[in-house]
């Protein structure tokens, strides 16, 4: 299986900054925002967006971690390790994940969000949209669109979890 780096650390940082600016531009009431990262790498991405919002706007945006495993329809249900101590009712929730592929993780995330409260709206921010949707789900904020084949995989590496920042494509041989 061949792996190739397609996005380096600098380009990844720029994509996260661009997502942050787009969030600022499209949300008039930033004080109503709540960032929810989808475990695992979506959590680190959401924290980085939270830090950039703090730097750019001086706001401490509430943050939570969502475990979608209990809500998946294509995998065995597992223990819920969600960590959201925020009332999301009436808030503008931004779900954050590393890669958007079939849409099944996001559908599960929305189920998890609805279980916690009734947000005013839910938006989606992803670092990579690779296509191949099985459900009618579209990201509001996309760092990079990287079309892939079904025999390819996008691997997002984040320093908090993997020791470095990069995006790789892995092809089946």
Curated annotation (Swiss-Prot):
* Gene3D superfamilies, alphabetized: 3.40.50.2020
- Write out the residue ranges of the motif PRPP-binding: 93-105
Q: Which CDD domains match?
A: PRTases_typeI
The catalysed reaction is: UMP + diphosphate = 5-phospho-alpha-D-ribose 1-diphosphate + uracil
Q: Which parts form a coiled-coil structure per UniProt?
A: none
Name the SUPFAM superfamilies for this protein: PRTase-like
Q: What is its EC number?
A: 2.4.2.9
Q: How does it assemble?
A: Homodimer and homohexamer; in equilibrium.
- What is the documented function of this protein? Regulates transcriptional attenuation of the pyrimidine nucleotide (pyr) operon by binding in a uridine-dependent manner to specific sites on pyr mRNA. This disrupts an antiterminator hairpin in the RNA and favors formation of a downstream transcription terminator, leading to a reduced expression of downstream genes. Also displays a weak uracil phosphoribosyltransferase activity which is not physiologically significant.
Family the UniProt entry places it in? Belongs to the purine/pyrimidine phosphoribosyltransferase family. PyrR subfamily.
Q: What is this protein called?
A: Bifunctional protein PyrR
Q: What is the lineage of its organism?
A: Bacteria, Bacillati, Bacillota, Bacilli, Lactobacillales
Gene name, Swiss-Prot/TrEMBL: pyrR
């Amino acid at each position: 299986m061949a792996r190739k780096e397609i996005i380096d650390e600098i380009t990844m940082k720029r994509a996260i900054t661009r997502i942050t600016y787009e969030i600022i531009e499209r949300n008039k009431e930033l004080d109503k925002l709540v960032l929810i990262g989808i475990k695992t790498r979506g959590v680190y991405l959401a924290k980085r967006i939270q830090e950039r919002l703090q730097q750019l706007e001086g706001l401490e945006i509430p943050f939570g971690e969502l475990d979608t495993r209990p809500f998946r329809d294509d995998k065995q249900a597992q223990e819920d390790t969600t960590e959201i101590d925020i009332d999301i009712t009436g808030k503008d929730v931004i779900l954050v994940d590393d890669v958007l592929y079939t849409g099944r993780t996001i559908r599960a995330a929305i189920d998890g969000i609805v279980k916690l409260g009734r947000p005013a709206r839910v938006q989606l921010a992803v670092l990579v949209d690779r296509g191949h949707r099985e459900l009618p789900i579209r990201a509001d904020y996309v760092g990079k669109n990287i079309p892939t084949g079904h025999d390819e995989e996008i691997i997002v590496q984040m320093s908090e979890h993997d020791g470095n920042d990069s995006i790789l494509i892995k092809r089946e041989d």
